[in-house]
Amino acid sequence: IMTIRIGINPLTWTNDDLPSLGASTPLSQCLSEGKLAGYAGFELGNKFPRESDQLNQVLAEHELALISGWYSGKLLEHSVEDEIKAIEDHLQLLKQCGSTVMVYCEVTGCIHGEQNTPLSKRPTIAADAWQDYGNRLSKVANYCLSQGVQLAYHHHMGTIVETSEEIDLLMENTSESLGLLLDTGHLTYAGGDPIATFKKYQNRIVH
């Protein structure tokens, strides 16, 4: 029998992309209200400690788990080795706090934080570059998995993986060590069909 835990991102209370939203809301309120609502855990947000002992203590006080944490990947401008080095501190924090999934999104050239830039200006990858990018991303995912943490790729508006077609290219060009985070909101906004994508990649959806 599969056990599924339901967690939440703190952007319901505070927003990392627009810090003014929820700026006055303390972390304790996010956690206590999340627990009261029945969630089993939280993803990281900008108000969370980044030292494992402190983070574990804060979560334990509310009987909550750390379910994941976003990482802004830059593999398009890094070598595999440099990306692994850059990711290491975040990876270790997740491990030390009992999380087995890392939310990963390629943000090189992204525009989702630029309110005055139209989505038509977002970065894209040429068709003949997907295989190389996928191979390199798979190597990063393999490393993280060897450390007990699976990468869950977050398709996101304003980035290189936004549409259903780009999710297809990502999945086709990466190994199964890379999981998929299915964000139904982002995919609907991009004009996709979340149900169809779920059915197509349900064996790779990990978050």
What are these regions (language model features)?
Residues I1-T100, L145, G179:
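N-terminal pre-domain/capping segments
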Residues D16-P19, I111, Y189-G192:
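A short, acidic/glycine-rich surface segment
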Residues G45-R50, G158-T159, G185-T188, G192-D193:
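Short beta->alpha connector loops
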Residues D53-Q54, E162-E166, G192-A196:
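Generic recognition of short, well-ordered alpha-helical segments
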Residues N56-E63, D168-T174, F198-Q202:
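Short, surface-exposed basic-aromatic patches at helix termini and helix-loop junctions that form
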Residues A65, S177, R204-H207:
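A general structural signal for well-ordered secondary-structure junctions
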Residues V80-L182, Y189:
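Active-site acidic/histidine proton-transfer and metal-coordination neighborhood
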Residues D193-H207:
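Aromatic-lined glycan-binding groove of carbohydrate-active enzymes
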